[in-house]
C-alpha cells in the first residue's frame, strides 16, 4: 500500500504533544498472555506449566469478544484458579491483513498489555513455555535500570530486504538505520510506568497497524518505538552501537535463540520447529513452539525438548476434561 509519510509522522507528533495519560495500574507484577479458541490446547499447556513450575504471580489471560466460550475460559483457569484470570479485551484490537490476504490479530498482544492490571508485566505468547519459573527476570539488572527486557529473533536471508539503509522500515518509523538486532516478542518484560511513552508509541502503532505491521507484525514495533523515542530525546542523527554501547535504551538478552525439535518445513530459521530462547548466562529459558503449536491431537513429540513429556501430559489431561464434561 502507499503510505503518506507526512500523515503518519503527524500522528506520532500529535501523540507526543498530547502525552497520553497512563491508566492507574496496581503496583506489582503479573504474567500476561492471550488465547483464542484455536489455541486452546497451547494456552492450557502454558497455564499448566506456570502452575507446575511454581509461579506465584497473577496470570492475566486476554481474549477478544467471541474468541473463547465460557467452558474454554473455565478450562484455562482450572490449573490454578487462585492466580489465573481470563479477561475480555475492551479496546479495539484490530486485525491486520497480510500480503497473503489472511487476518492476523497481532494487536491483541499490545491491547492485553495495555489493559493488564499491574504496572510491571512479563508477556508470554501462549506458545512460549518457560523451562523454569521466570519470575526471576523481574530482578534482571538491565530490566531494573531500563524498565524493559527483550530477546533477539532468528533471521534468514529472505528478511534482509527489510534492513538495508534505504528500506521503508526506517522511513515509516522515523529511525536512522542501525545495527540493532530484530526482536522476537514471544516474551518480553515492560515496566509501564518507567517506559510509558515508549509503550504508548507501541500502542499507537497497533491502533494504526495498517501502516506499521508490514515489517513482521507487532514484533518490530517494540524495537522501533524504543529507538524512535531515544532519537527524539538525543537527536535523530545520534549514533548508538547497539552491540556494545551502554546507551542502548532497552534491556536486551545477550544470547540469541537456537532451534530444536523436528525439522521445520521451510528448511530455515535454524532448521527446527521449537525456538529456544536463553537467559542472561546462556541457559535455556523458553521453548517457543511457534511452528508446530499444540492441538488436541496429532502433536509431534520432540525428544530433545526440555519438559516435552509434561507438555503432552497436559494435552492428555485437557482431552480427559473435555470428554468428562462433554465440552
Positions of predicted regions on the chain:
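Conserved catalytic core of nucleotide-sugar-dependent glycosyltransferases
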Residues: 96-98, 140-200
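Hydrophobic targeting segments
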Residues: 29-33, 50, 59-61
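Short, charged/polar "capping" segments at the starts of alpha-helices
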Residues: 40-41, 66-73, 158-159
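Active-site-proximal specificity loops/subdomain of glycosyltransferases
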Residues: 71-116
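GT-A fold catalytic core of metal-dependent nucleotide-sugar glycosyltransferases
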Residues: 105-163, 188-189
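Histidine-anchored nucleotide/phosphate-binding helix
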Residues: 33, 37-54
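Short internal beta-strands
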Residues: 58-67, 150
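A glycosyltransferase accessory/donor-loop signature
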Residues: 1-35, 39, 177-327
Amino acid at each position: 500500500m502507499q503510505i503518506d509519510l507526512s500523515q503518519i509522522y503527524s500522528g506520532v507528533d500529535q501523540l507526543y504533544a498530547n502525552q497520553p495519560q497512563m491508566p492507574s495500574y496496581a503496583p506489582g507484577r503479573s504474567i500476561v498472555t492471550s488465547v483464542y479458541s484455536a489455541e486452546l490446547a497451547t494456552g492450557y499447556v502454558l497455564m499448566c506449566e506456570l502452575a507446575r513450575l511454581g509461579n506465584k504471580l497473577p496470570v492475566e489471560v486476554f481474549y477478544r469478544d467471541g474468541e473463547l466460550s465460557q467452558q474454554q475460559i473455565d478450562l484455562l483457569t482450572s490449573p490454578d484458579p487462585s492466580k489465573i484470570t481470563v479477561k475480555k479485551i475492551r479496546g479495539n484490537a484490530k486485525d491486520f491483513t497480510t500480503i497473503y490476504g489472511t487476518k492476523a490479530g497481532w494487536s491483541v498482544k499490545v491491547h492485553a498489555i495495555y489493559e493488564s492490571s499491574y504496572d510491571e508485566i512479563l508477556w508470554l505468547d501462549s506458545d512460549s513455555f518457560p523451562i523454569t519459573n521466570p519470575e526471576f527476570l523481574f530482578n534482571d539488572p538491565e530490566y531494573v535500570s531500563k524498565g524493559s527486557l527483550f530477546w533477539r529473533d532468528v533471521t534468514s536471508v529472505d528478511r534482509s530486504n527489510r534492513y538495508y539503509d534505504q528500506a521503508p522500515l526506517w522511513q515509516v518509523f522515523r529511525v536512522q538505520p542501525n545495527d540493532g538486532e530484530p526482536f522476537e516478542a514471544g516474551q518480553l518484560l515492560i515496566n509501564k510506568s518507567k517506559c510509558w511513552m515508549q509503550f504508548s508509541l507501541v500502542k499507537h502503532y497497533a491502533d494504526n497497524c495498517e501502516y506499521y505491521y508490514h515489517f513482521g507484525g507487532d514484533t518490530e514495533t517494540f524495537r522501533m518505538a524504543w529507538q524512535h523515542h531515544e532519537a527524539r530525546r538525543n537527536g535523530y542523527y545520534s549514533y548508538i552501537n547497539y552491540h556494545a554501547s551502554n546507551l542502548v535504551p532497552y534491556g536486551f538478552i545477550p544470547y540469541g535463540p537456537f532451534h530444536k525439535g523436528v525439522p521445520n518445513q521451510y528448511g530455515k530459521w535454524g532448521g527446527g520447529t521449537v525456538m529456544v530462547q536463553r537467559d542472561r548466562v546462556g541457559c535455556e529459558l523458553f521453548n517457543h513452539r511457534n511452528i508446530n503449536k499444540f492441538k488436541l491431537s496429532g502433536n509431534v513429540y520432540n525428544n530433545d525438548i526440555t519438559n516435552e513429556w509434561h507438555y503432552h501430559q497436559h494435552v492428555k489431561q485437557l482431552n480427559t476434561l473435555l470428554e468428562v464434561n462433554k465440552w
